[in-house]
Amino acid sequence: METMKRSLAALAATTGAALVLPAAAYAALADVGKVPGDEPVPACPQSPCLAISRTTGYQAKVGDVRPVDVVPEDGRLVAWSITLGKPGTKQTAFFNENLGGEASAQLTVLRPGRKLYHRVVAQGDVQKLQPYFGSTVQFALKESIPVKKGYVVALTVPTCAPALAVSQPGTTSWRATRGKGKCNDFDAQTAQVGVNNITRAYCLYRTARLTYSATMVTDPKPTAPPAEAPSADAPAAAAPPAPAAP
């Protein structure tokens, strides 16, 4: 019996040693645009039914959280989600007739510059939204989008999108790519629909919340520093002797 106990102890020690594995470098999923405890509800179908129209926008602040739609780490965007209100039949017809057609939106990545200027660096495909009114829908990107820490993940709406929560606290605000003096011109087309466009998100709208977010996979973190290149002063290794001829 004592011999068996010693054998089992040795086996356990051997097994435990075998389970000591190297550290793993994993990527992680992250949500851009989500705030814990914040579940905004779009305004539609209440009256007035307010929607985002013909612009590109991003959330600037939610309570004490700032920034909101900014990429936290280098990685790749893989999907985006949007919570949509459910406009009534007459409300939907009004938007379709006056804002260029059926509700639609796409994800847009902005590289921020100075004084609220941004450059469009990437975009996803335009998605039709009307089939998903009254729900939260997630769209996978056909091709993931590489992003850098500090980039802004915005929503471009070429027509309209019932994805706007109103009557929020005064500490909540979002920005749109409308110019100075044009913040109340909701009919003018200011949606950014071309990569490399330079735009300015001048207009700030308080007490309102955009109801979209994006999902990203962060780059894996290295578990060891990169190997240093050998110094020029390091001694050269001796070459092996040449084979001797018989």
Feature annotation, model-predicted:
Residues S53-P72, T136-F139:
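Short beta-strands within extracellular/lumenal beta-sheet-rich domains
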Residues A12-P22:
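Bacterial N-terminal signal peptides
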Residues A28-C49, N98-Q192:
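Aromatic- and Gly/Pro-enriched, solvent-exposed loop/edge beta-strand patches characteristic
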Residues E97-P112, T172-P246:
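PGST-rich, cysteine-poor low-complexity/disordered linker and tail segments that act as flexible spacers
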Residues M1-T14:
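N-terminal export and membrane-targeting signals
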Residues V70-S81, K86-K90:
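Extended extracellular/luminal ectodomain segments enriched in beta-structured repeat modules
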Residues T56-V65, P87-F94, G100:
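A sequence-level detector for low-complexity, Ser/Thr- and acidic-rich stretches
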Residues A23-A27:
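Sec/Tat signal peptide C-region and signal peptidase I cleavage site
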